[in-house]
Amino acid sequence: MIPKKIHYCWFGENEKPLLVIECIKSWQKYCPDYEIMEWNSKNYDVHKNKYMEQAYQAKRWGFVSDYARLDIIYQYGGIYLDTDVELIRSLDDLLETDGYIGFEKNVDE
């Protein structure tokens, strides 16, 4: 079973825009019993490998998150969400599987 943990990355210490704040509120609303964990340079070692270190120094936060998200899920389990993902219902139905991957599709296509 996948643990009730939602992980997200916020490297760079910039203030979160309103969209990100609203998306995180949707996670709290639809998954109130989940632990929501923000990963950043204070609680994640961005010097784990040369790729991440170079990306961090270049302020390429998305590249830092690309590696960190996989490492975090591998180590702690749970669900990783990008900060622009808005939930419209609980994620509980996904927890009984061994794993899954999601992707976005433009609804206009």
Where are these regions (language model features)?
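GT-A fold catalytic core of metal-dependent nucleotide-sugar glycosyltransferases
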Residues: 62-108
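An acidic/histidine-cluster motif and surrounding catalytic segment
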Residues: 35, 46-63, 94
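Residue-identity detector for glutamine
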Residues: 28, 54-57, 75
